[in-house]
């Protein structure tokens, strides 16, 4: 069959590369990176580390959310399928640096991603684009530098939800826990006609005051505004029906 013939041909190529000490390049897709053992171990270890440090969930579920939100944003604004795929790959990998250290995790993640991506059949330009997006996603050291990084930033910083709070007694919640737990509803809406990206939050003010929310998230929301500007759009934030940003 055709499939059997392709398998035999692939095996011959691998054997040839082993004999001649040449690298076997693997075509890359979002599906592939989601099933990359090294990437998933880094995400698992990073999430464990952050759990011990008291941070909210940064598991694969968060990374999938970021990847798919970034892709949705670019798709709505008619970016190419190629750019969308790069954003999904960068979005899924963006937090691998937490396995090394939370501080400068974006830069560590970029360095790790650069080495991991070398085993795939990616152009140098695409690899650098992904690495740059990962390295610039943290509000303390980065910012949007191109549409891929801009979409990743918005996908990451708008992932505010109750389910990201780890299971623990409510009495032990810190401000980050309270802020996320207080968000009872979150929607990200994209109006392509008006070129507006809107984050709409419903916050239980009995759990967290609006002041506490902005104490934690103001810089992240301002980063989203900068990312939206790069995309040629406007970022708006609404909390409990009132326009905030």
Residue ranges and their predicted role:
Residues 123-184:
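Histidine/acidic-rich helix-loop-helix segments that form or flank divalent-metal centers
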Residues 8, 13-14, 24-26:
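Short hydrophobic transmembrane-like helices used for membrane targeting/insertion
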Residues 27-105:
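Acidic/His-rich, divalent-metal-binding segments that scaffold phosphate/diphosphate chemistry
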Residues 159-245:
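Terminal helices and disordered tails flanking the catalytic cores of nucleotide-processing hydrolases
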Residues 87, 91, 108, 134, ...:
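Short alpha-helical catalytic segment bearing the HExxH-like zincin motif
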Residues 35, 44-54, 75, 79, ...:
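Extended, compositionally biased eukaryotic interaction scaffolds
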Residues 67-70, 105-119:
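An active-site-proximal "capping" alpha-helix that borders the catalytic cofactor pocket
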């Amino acid at each position: 069959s055709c499939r059997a013939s392709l398998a035999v041909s692939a095996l011959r190529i691998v054997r040839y590369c082993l004999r001649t000490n040449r690298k076997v390049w693997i075509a890359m897709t979002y599906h592939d990176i989601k099933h990359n053992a090294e990437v998933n171990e880094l995400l698992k270890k990073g999430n464990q580390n952050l759990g011990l440090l008291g941070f909210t969930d940064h598991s694969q579920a968060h990374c999938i959310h970021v990847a798919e939100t970034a892709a949705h944003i670019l798709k709505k604004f008619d970016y190419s399928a190629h750019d969308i795929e790069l954003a999904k790959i960068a979005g899924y990998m963006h937090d691998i640096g937490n396995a090394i250290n939370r501080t400068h995790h974006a830069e560590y993640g970029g360095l790790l991603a650069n080495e991991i991506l070398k085993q795939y059949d990616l152009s140098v330009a695409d690899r650098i684009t992904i690495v740059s997006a990962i390295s610039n996603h943290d509000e303390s050291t980065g910012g949007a530098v191109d549409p891929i990084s801009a979409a990743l930033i918005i996908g990451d910083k708008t992932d505010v939800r109750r389910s990201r709070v780890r299971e623990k007694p409510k009495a032990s919640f810190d401000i980050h826990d309270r802020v996320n737990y207080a968000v009872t509803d979150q929607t990200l809406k994209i109006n392509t006609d008006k070129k507006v990206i809107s984050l709409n939050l419903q916050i239980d003010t009995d759990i967290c005051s609006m002041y506490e929310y902005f104490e934690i998230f103001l810089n992240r929301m301002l980063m989203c505004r900068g990312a939206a500007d790069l995309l040629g759009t406007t970022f708006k934030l609404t909390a409990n029906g009132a326009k905030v940003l």
